[in-house]
Structure formats: C-alpha cells, structure tokens
Amino acid sequence: MPYINVSTSAKIEDKKKLLEEISTLVSSLTNKSKRFVMAKLDDNLEMYFDDERPCCFLEIKSIGSLSPSEMAKPISNFVWEKMGIPIDRIYISFIDVPASFWSWNGRTFG
C-alpha cells in the first residue's frame, strides 16, 4: 500500500512510464516505500464530465499517511503536466483504509 487507481478518457502513449512516475510521486507524498506502492491505469475510457473533453478520476487508498489537502495539488499538477488534462477536469478520492482491512503476503496489517 498505497494503491493508486487512475481512470481517464485520455489515450496514454507510455503507460509504464506514467505508472512509474505516479508511483514515485505518491510514495514521496505518503512517505511510504515505493516498493509497496501499487498503481493501475485504465486509459481511453468512455467518460463524461459535463462534456466529452478528456477527464481523469484517481482513487488513492492507503493505511494512514494520507493528507488530502496537501496531496491534491501536486497530484493534480502531475495529471495536467503528464496527461494534459486540466485541473478542473480531475477528481481525486482519498481513502484511508483500516489496517485490519488491508492484506499483503497472506496477512492483514492490523
């Protein structure tokens, strides 16, 4: 953990690079080892957000370490700079998951 789920209507050319870069960013923002960051990207989706211009929805889950008010701007800027999606067309959901509800390596964290 953390887990980053990126859904966008934009077509992303270098998916592996984008996943690597957003993993690095979220690792830095949460002070969690990049080794434990998992990221998923679904691009070129049919999405609607007031109209059909490109948009993006990010879901970020973690056991603690989330500071939505501090993380929203750098993540939005990343999406704008790397994906070309304006900040006003981005939603981000931050979800703090209890340790007892998150499992890795056959065991929960709490």
Q: What kind of region is each of these model predictions?
A:
Residues 1-110:
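Interaction-mediating elements
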